[in-house]
From Swiss-Prot:
It is found in: Cytoplasm. Heterotrimer of UreA (gamma), UreB (beta) and UreC (alpha) subunits. Three heterotrimers associate to form the active enzyme. It comes from Nocardia farcinica (strain IFM 10152). Its EC number is 3.5.1.5. The keyword DNA repair does not apply. This is Urease subunit gamma. Coiled coil: none annotated. The lineage of its organism: Bacteria, Bacillati, Actinomycetota, Actinomycetes, Mycobacteriales.
């Protein structure tokens, strides 16, 4: 199986998000890379499902709370920007202050 660099990046991100979900299910608090992976995966999958940019910008802020992540992580993540493929093309989705 041959994957383009873009496809490899998406696959790695998807795996990182899955690992974060498993750790979260075990009751562990997520670190910075895990939190970003989970939010990014939420946006990418939402775009794939046909949700709008505005909808994903809003729902991206509900993926994680301060209780879900390690101390200091919310302050480290000001914005998460994701280039997602929608049915009508590729768009940049910015989730501002994603961890409330």
């Amino acid at each position: 199986m041959r994957l383009s660099p873009h496809e490899q990046e998406r696959l790695l991100l998807s795996y990182a998000a899955e690992l974060a979900r498993r750790r979260q299910a075990r009751g562990l608090k997520l670190n910075h890379p895990e939190a970003v992976a989970l939010i990014t995966d939420h946006v990418l999958e939402g775009a794939r499902d046909g949700r709008s940019v505005a909808e994903l910008m809003a729902s991206g802020r509900t993926v994680l709370t301060r209780d879900d992540v390690m101390t200091g992580v919310p302050e480290m993540i000001h914005d998460v920007q994701v280039e997602a493929t929608f049915p009508d093309g590729t768009k940049l989705v910015t989730v501002h202050q994603p961890i409330a």
